[in-house]
């Protein structure tokens, strides 16, 4: 099994699990939506659906290029919520706060792995549409 395939399977599993949890147990996700944002439950549902769509795209060969790019955008988009959760973790046990702060730098490999999948799935192709030379 190639490294890229292992990474892809890991991301599919991670995104599927997290996406399902957004619907089965939304309360923890609602609690980490930054206070300034309205419609917290709706945002959680949309982000959960987005994770499931990204997982499905990564799982299917025809969707990997777009799925990788979409996953990178998704991991970038949820980063503020992860920061918010870490900042607001004051009354939690020490190990929990360490885990919340420790996971922030882990967003970087998730984004890079997603981009790697997109790049390798579409080697030499544009993500969307045709190049000017093809038109």
Where do the PLM segments sit?
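Short amphipathic, positively biased membrane-proximal segments
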Residues: 1-135
